[in-house]
Amino acid sequence: MKREIVYFKSDGLKLKGQLFIPEKTPCPVLCLCHGMPRKGLANPNDRGYAGLAERFVNAGFLTVTFNFRGSGASEGNFDIRGWTRDLKAVLDHIYKMKRADQGKIALLGFSAGAAVSIYTAAQDRRISSVIACACPDTSRLAKNRELAQTVIADYRSMGVIKDDNFPPSLQEWMQGFDEIYSDKWIDKLAPRPIFIIHGDQDDVVSPTSAFNLYKRAGDPKEILVVKGAGHRLRISEQAMDHALAWLKSRTFRD
């Protein structure tokens, strides 16, 4: 396995990512999409998305991790519509890579990253399959102005929103969540497969979101509710074991 630092350009912003490359290429690709930044989640034993990426690269997937705008070492301010453009920029880069099997590009998204993955896959046929973990089907930020202002203030203190004059329009920033966090996109993935995973103890996104999304999705589709798991499914061994097994079955079946 090799690791390479890579930068993507989106709306003039520089986004930082990493490629985890198996020995044998060209090969299928998995792009990991993180969720909205949150406070107080540091865990010295958590190897983060890099640790998760190694799990998939060892199974033969060229695995891509990156930070959406406003997050980690990437430039810009947090904006959910902007995240969809960021993912498109990453996919554009992947599609040009000689080490990638362009016919097998999968997304594994978590929470907001799952919503962005579904939205993007609904409009981008280059994506062959999606795994959506702890995915919301609606957002309180789309309707609650006071909550949106609180989140923006928190993100400003965290450095996720860096510019004092951002967002230029609070209403448009909120409307982005109404557009992206929606069950109206998921049926457009068919006949490409989707796997929905949710924890039954998720206190951030209700498990009812998973069932609603599953109901709206076209075939082929699968759903898994992990007993005892909370919102952070990335650190659930059971959830990620099932995600890897499902992805392998969908990717290497032929």
Language-model regions: role of each:
Residues 37, 68-72, 137, 230:
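Alpha/beta-hydrolase active-site loop signature
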Residues 23-55:
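Short, surface-exposed "cap/lid" segments of acyl-processing enzymes
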Residues 51-73:
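Conserved alpha/beta-hydrolase
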